[in-house]
Amino acid sequence: MKDFAIVICAYTGVTSSTAACIERCHQELEDKFEVFYYTEDAFIDRVRNIATTHFLKSDHSPYMIFIDHDILFTPGDIHRLYQDLCNGYHLIGGLYSVRDGGHVALSTIRQEIRLDGTIKEVRYLATGFMGFDKEILTQMVDKLKLPLLHEKSWCECYPFFTFCYSRSRKILLSEDWTFCVNARKAGYKVFVDTSIQVGHKGQKIYFPRDCSKEYQCK
């Protein structure tokens, strides 16, 4: 069994920069993890559900880390996120900016968040650098009574990630934000480790430090 699994869902393929980051992790972390690529489906909700269901049903590792195809990170970033999971944070991620560097890709509970290197509870966490364990998935299935869809087909999955909307806030919720909603419904909190600040490749590479130290929620 490996310590954790890295999963990349990328219909357009993985950037060379992200591939280089993964190779560096292989060199420094050796055989502590496996990488799984899901690249032949443009329906991001479905592919994330398939990948997460595969992880839940497998025995190759206790923790899973989603990384987007255009995120830049170090072995230290991966190791810190893995340690957070080992320390009992069932759903936690690192910080990264949106592609234009305008703000950090998460939504806070308070109006502002200080990027001070501590772990903080947030409302919504994006999947670009997100980790979780099998317990939270099992509890989602049991407590939310999630059905197994497309059983025994190539796309068999539980609907952990679904694009929907919030009636109370009157906003659209992306599949990763809905995952956070489901986690809270199952009795869990959502966290971000502000000591983990990874890059996001757009027209240039942006890091959270390129955004304001304090920023308004989007």
Predicted regions and their residues:
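Conserved catalytic core of nucleotide-sugar-dependent glycosyltransferases
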Residues: 52, 74-164
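C-terminal catalytic/acceptor-binding lobe
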Residues: 144-218
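Anion (oxyanion) recognition and catalysis
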Residues: 30, 86, 184
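Active-site nucleotide-sugar/metal-binding loop of Leloir-type enzymes
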Residues: 49-63
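Polar low-complexity intrinsically disordered regions
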Residues: 8-9, 25, 41, 70, ...
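N-proximal low-complexity "stem/linker" segments adjacent to membrane-targeting elements
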Residues: 1-42, 46
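Short beta-strand-to-loop acidic/aromatic patch adjacent to the donor-nucleotide binding site
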Residues: 60-72
